[in-house]
Amino acid sequence: MLTPPPDLKITRLPHNKSVEDMLAEGEVDALIHSDIIKPMEAGDPRVARLWPDYKAEEIRFYKKTQIFPIMHVMGIRQEIVDRHPWIPINLFHAFEKSKAIGMRRMENPRIVPLAWYLEAWNEQQEILGPDPWEYGLGDKNKHNMNTIAGYSHEQGLTKHRWTTDDLFTSTFQGRKRGDEWRI
């Protein structure tokens, strides 16, 4: 259970409201979201990005910190791993194989209906490398996770400064950047 620092106020989201609507209504000041939220899609003038040229800001941040935010983390209860130690690495390989199939498809410029898709794809690879959302605990993800864990500790969200070795099983070494997509 999280025990927040005394100066941090946590309020539960009402069941009858979305955080997107609350932002548009001015009930919350800011929102971090992985999707483009409905008020932005609708062109609601009450909602705007923090940085108008967000792409340039994200690129600047990446070049400065080498952090590209992790989208998801997979967790398996320790009791499951203890009983079935083959599960983590086999799940990892299954997800890697699935991703490899998808990424191979992305190399085809006709996979998405965008006129300049290939140019955007190549630009992303030039800046972020071949796989910005790599799986496993390679050097990039360890750097990301250790940095985030450090921020959590500095901001009083955790009492201990955790590392990836504390939080994750050692079976996930991951694919190295630049490796070919394998199927």
What are these regions (language model features)?
Residues 75, 80-154:
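Secondary-structure end/capping motifs
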Residues 16, 28-33, 94, 127-136, ...:
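Intrinsic disorder and flexible coil segments
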Residues 137-183:
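Long, low-complexity C-terminal extensions of enzymes
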Residues 49, 117, 121, 177-179:
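Alpha-helix boundary/capping detector
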Residues 4-107:
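Pocket-lining segment of extracytoplasmic ligand-binding domains
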Residues 18, 44, 55, 113-115, ...:
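Serine/threonine-rich low-complexity intrinsically disordered regions
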Residues 49, 67, 79-80, 127, ...:
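Residue-level preference for alpha-helix termini and adjacent loops
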